[in-house]
Each structure stands twice: as C-alpha cells, then as structure tokens.
C-alpha cells in the first residue's frame, strides 16, 4: 500500500513535469481477464494479456490519484522470462546493444500509444547522486517494484499491518471530497526527499512511509467519516487481509517459479479496493486515527527493516530492472575506473611533458641570456672599435701634411740610394781591376822567385868552385900565373855573385813595397765596400720603416694599400 500511495503521489499532474519518460497523461492498463468472481476463486490469469493504454487524464486539476486497479496493473509490470522467440508483452520492449566486452545487453523500453518509446539504455539510466537528471522517475521503476514485494511480505507476516493498510486505503478511496492544499506540497516534498538520497533502498522506504503519513495528514482536515464507518473499514480490511495473506503466498510461489511474475490472486483481492461504493459491514470502533497512524509508522519501520534485509539478500534475477541497473552500474564503475586510470596516466604524462618543457625553456632561457651577454660584449667591442676608427680618422685628417713631407723625404732617400748603388757599382769595377793587378803581381812574384832560385843555384855553384880553387891554390902555390888567372875569375865570380844578390835584394824590396801598396789599397777598397754596404742596409731599413708608415697612413685615410705610389718605381729601380 505504501508503494501504491507512492505511485499515487508521483502520478499527480503537478509532479509529472519531473518525469522525462512519461508525458503529462495518465497511464491506464487494460487487462484481458474474466469476471471478478473468477479472480476470487483463485484462478490464475494469463500473463500474456497485459496491454498499455495511454489515455488523457480526465481533469488536470484533480487532486485524486489513480485507482487501485490501475496501480496494481502498473505494479504488476515486471520482466517476463526470456523466451526463444524474444517476445515481450504488456507494452514492454527490449533493445539489444553491444557492450564493451563484445556481448549483448537487453534494455527494457516502454512504448506509448503514439509509438514513442522510453528506453532504459545506458544513457537513460540514473547517475548516482543525480537522480533528478534521469529520463524516468525513481519511484516508477525499481523502488516501486521492491516496495510491492515489501507489501506482500507485510501482508504475509501479520494481520495487524494489513488492517492498518486496509483502513488507510479505504479511507483514501471512500472519501470523495477533493483533497485540500497540503497534498501537493507533501507529495513534491516526498519526491524530492526520495530523489536526493544516496541509497535507493532507504529512499523507497522513506518515500512509501512519508506518502502514507502525508495521505493521513492531507485527509485529516476534511475527514468527516463517523467512527462506526472507521471501525467498519477496519473490519473490512481484516477480511481482505486474510485473503491477501494467501495471495501473497501464491505470489511468492509464482515469482519463484517464473522469476518476476505476480499472481492473479493478489490482483483479484486488491482489485476489491476499487469498489468504493460498497457499504462496509458494521464493525465496532477499535482504534483512533492517531493510534492507527502511530502503529502504521511503527510497523512500516519494522517491515522496512525486514524489507531492507530481504532486498540485501535477494538475487538480481528477481527484478530485471535491478539487474540491468546493477550491470550498468558495474559497467559504469569499471569504465569510471578505466577513465580515472587513463586520465591519471594522461595527467602524469602531461605533467612530465610540462616538466620537460619547463626544463627545456629554462635551458633555452639560459642560452638566450648567454647569447645576450655575448652580443652585448660584441656590441661594446664594436662600439670601442668604432670610436678608435673615428679617432684614427680624425688623426689621419690632421696627418695629411705629415704624409706629404714623408713622401718627399722618401723620394730624396730613394735618390740617395740610387747614387749609392752607382758608387757601389764603380767601386766594384775598381776592385775587379785591382784584383787583376794583384793576380799579375802574383805571377811576377812567382817568376821572380824562380829567378832567385836559379841565381841561388848559380851562386852555390860559384861558391863551390871558389872553394875548389882555393884548395887548389893552397896545394899548388908554384903555378903563379895560373893562379892569377884563377883569382881573376874568382873575383869576377864574386862580383857577379854580389851583383846578383843585390839585384835579388832589390827585387825583393820592390816586391815587398808593391805588396804593401797592394795590401793597403785592398784594405781601403774593402773598407769602402763595407761602408757602402752598411749605408745601403741602413737606407733599406729606413725605407721599409717609411713604407710601413705610409701604408698605415693610407689605411687610416682609406686609400687602398695596393695602389702604386710615385716613389715606389724609383725604389725598385
């Protein structure tokens, strides 16, 4: 009943703008089945008979929700067992998509009357913490189905809770006057409260409990039913509760056999709640409205804890939407982990690239700074050189007359050098002449020496002859006339010898005198030649120095050093 009231509050036209899957129309479900008596006799009703029929809501401003038959028809929409022909009934369709691992996923799709489908694909499933952005309402799918399962467990566990739920449902169905203003704010508050939670099971439980209490509070100002009718409604729901116990047991057996289908017994018993015009049997008043609400809240809390435990222990095959949601949630979490890892790796790569680029930029900045320093130094040196060139240019402008004087001096020195060269050539000719004379004198000296040697030989012969004659004279003194002749010859020979000696000595003296004169002249010539050479060398060095100075002056002035000067021809000659 709490799930039914939750759907009643969610189907309010004031809250339909929050659901993206359904338009602002009331969804009614037409069920092809027999009479009510056949349902009461516990006959099963085929599951292939559900059809979705979309009809416009009769009154947009009606504060009353859907009937119990429509609510139960909506709650009985569950996933059928997958058959070989892939046939789906009750206006439900499934779309097959390929998952990331290569498999196929089936997603349920609602088809409206105008052939517009509401799919429960990956893009339409709700995100955790953002339930208000989904394409369908949170209470229209998983929460309501599990809430209906919790209703069956509530009916099966005891009769007191069934009585309380029956009394509340009877009061909501019998009271025909329109509800007052606090209904819509309470419903919207309950919807917002159910959507803002993080746990879906706690949201469904708080939603159903809040809707039941809000229904009591909304009807309490305009409640005008007598205490006898309240007791009668409680007794009537006690009678219905017994049948609901059997129906809930049958429903659980059927769901265990067919994996998610509901029994028609619960449909038959709960469809009696639609008949609000039947007069309730007379029962005595048992409890007040506050006690019923308090007891209902306590039982709802207890059964909510039990339902939460059952939901935790239930398998995913009991609810197809839950299975789809869990599969999608698992896939989303895996994809989220992969995306986190991918983006973490990308972030690490980007950070490394940024660090490398930062280091490269720092290195480039350092190189640029060094290059800037080097260029600054070169600029300073070029500025200094330009200043020096300017100074040299100013000096060259002032050294114009000095350059002319130096050119004149150079021309004079070149003339002197040419004269010295002429004198050198004359002296060399004289030297050659003197050398010829020396050679002739040497030949004459050799001839004189030969003559002297001959004369010495003759004198030696004469001396030997003289000695022989003296010896003979001493031995033969008798021969006087002969001796006189010999003495005459001897004297003559002595005189000739003395003459030859004197001539030889005279020749030696003349030769010595000539030799001395030649030597003196030779020394004079050599000394003069040395002086000429030294002066020539000195003039040559001075000429080179002057040429260098002229070249420097020309470079300072801007003239090309290769341009010939007037005095260079003279120097070369």
UniProtKB/Swiss-Prot annotation:
Task: Tell me the null mutant phenotype.
Answer: Morpholino knockdown severely impairs cranial nerve development, with shorter or missing cranial ganglia and reduced nerve arborization. Neural crest migration is impaired, although neural crest induction is not significantly affected. Brain size is reduced and cranial cartilage development is severely disrupted, leading to smaller head size. Eyes are smaller and deformed, with coloboma formation and disrupted retinal lamination. In eye, expression of the genes rax, pax6 and otx2 is reduced. In brain, expression of the genes emx1, pax6, otx2, en2 and egr2 is reduced.
Q: What keywords is this UniProt entry annotated with?
A: Cell projection, Coiled coil, Cytoplasmic vesicle, Developmental protein, Neurogenesis
Q: Which Pfam families match?
A: Fez1 (PF06818)
Mind telling me which GO cellular component terms the entry cites?
axon; cytoplasmic vesicle; dendrite
Q: Where is the composition biased (Polar residues)?
A: 184-196, 207-216
Disulphide bridges, residue numbers = none
List this protein's GO terms for biological process: nervous system development
Ranges for region Disordered: 168-216, 382-407
Keyword Magnesium included in the entry's annotation: no
Kindly list any coiled-coil regions of this protein: 289-539
* InterPro entries linked to this entry: N4BP3 (IPR033571)
Q: Where does the record place it?
A: Cytoplasmic vesicle; Cell projection, Axon; Cell projection, Dendrite
Question: Per its database record, what is this protein's job?
Answer: Plays a role in axon and dendrite arborization during cranial nerve development. Also important for neural crest migration and early development of other anterior structures including eye, brain and cranial cartilage.
Homology family = Belongs to the N4BP3 family.
Tell me what this protein is called: NEDD4-binding protein 3-A
Which species is the source of this protein?
Xenopus laevis (African clawed frog)
């Amino acid at each position: 009943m709490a799930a039914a009231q939750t759907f009643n509050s969610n189907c309010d036209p004031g809250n339909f703008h929050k659901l993206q899957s359904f338009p602002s129309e009331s969804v009614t479900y037409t069920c092809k089945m027999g009479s009510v008596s056949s349902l009461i006799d516990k006959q099963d009703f085929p599951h292939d008979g559900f059809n979705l029929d979309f009809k416009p809501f009769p009154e947009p401003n009606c504060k009353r929700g859907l009937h119990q038959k429509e609510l139960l028809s909506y709650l009985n929409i569950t996933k059928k067992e997958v058959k070989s022909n892939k046939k789906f009934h009750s206006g439900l369709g499934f779309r097959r998509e390929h998952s990331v691992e290569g498999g196929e996923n089936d997603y349920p799709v609602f088809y409206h009357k105008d052939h517009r489908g509401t799919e429960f694909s990956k893009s339409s499933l709700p995100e955790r913490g953002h339930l208000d952005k989904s394409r369908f309402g949170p209470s229209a799918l998983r929460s309501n189905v599990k809430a209906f399962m919790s209703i069956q467990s509530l009916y099966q566990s005891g009769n007191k809770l069934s009585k309380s739920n029956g009394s509340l449902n009877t009061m909501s169905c019998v009271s025909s006057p329109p509800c007052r203003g606090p209904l819509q704010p309470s419903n919207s508050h309950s919807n917002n409260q159910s959507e803002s939670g993080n746990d879906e099971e706690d949201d469904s439980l708080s939603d159903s409990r809040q809707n039941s209490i809000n229904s009591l509070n909304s009807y309490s100002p305009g409640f005008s039913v007598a205490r006898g009718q309240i007791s009668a409604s409680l007794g009537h729901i006690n009678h219905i509760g017994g049948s609901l116990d059997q129906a809930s047991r049958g429903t659980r057996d059927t769901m265990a056999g067919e994996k998610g289908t509901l029994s028609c017994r619960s449909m038959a018993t709960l469809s009696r709640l639609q008949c609000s015009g039947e007069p309730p049997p007379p029962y005595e008043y048992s409890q007040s409205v506050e006690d019923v609400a308090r007891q209902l809240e306590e039982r709802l809390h207890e059964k909510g804890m039990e339902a939460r435990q059952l939901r935790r222990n239930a398998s995913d095959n009991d609810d197809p939407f839950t299975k789809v949601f869990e599969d999608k949630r698992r896939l989303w979490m895996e994809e989220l982990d992969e995306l986190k890892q991918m983006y973490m790796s990308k972030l690490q790569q980007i950070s490394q690239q940024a660090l490398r680029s930062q280091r490269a930029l720092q290195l480039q900045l350092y190189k640029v700074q060094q290059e800037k320093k080097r260029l600054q130094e070169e600029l300073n040196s070029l500025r200094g050189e330009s200043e020096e060139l300017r100074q040299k240019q100013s000096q060259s402008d002032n050294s114009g007359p000095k350059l002319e004087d130096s050119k004149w001096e150079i021309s004079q020195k070149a003339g002197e050098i040419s004269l010295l060269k002429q004198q050198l050539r004359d002296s060399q000719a004289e030297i050659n002449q003197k050398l010829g004379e020396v050679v002739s004198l040497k030949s004459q000296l050799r001839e004189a020496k030969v003559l002297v040697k001959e004369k010495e030989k003759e004198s030696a012969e004469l001396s030997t002859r003289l000695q022989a004659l003296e010896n003979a004279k001493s031995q033969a003194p008798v021969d006087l006339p002969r001796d006189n002749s010999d003495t005459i010859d001897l004297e003559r020979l002595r005189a000739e010898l003395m003459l030859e000696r004197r001539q030889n000595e005279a020749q030696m003296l003349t030769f010595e005198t000539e030799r001395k004169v030649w030597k003196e002249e030779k020394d004079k010539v050599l000394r003069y030649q040395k002086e000429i050479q030294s002066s020539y060398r000195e003039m040559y060095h001075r000429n080179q120095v002057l040429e260098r100075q002229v070249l420097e002056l020309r470079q300072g002035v801007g003239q090309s050093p290769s341009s010939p000067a007037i005095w260079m021809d003279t120097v070369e000659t």
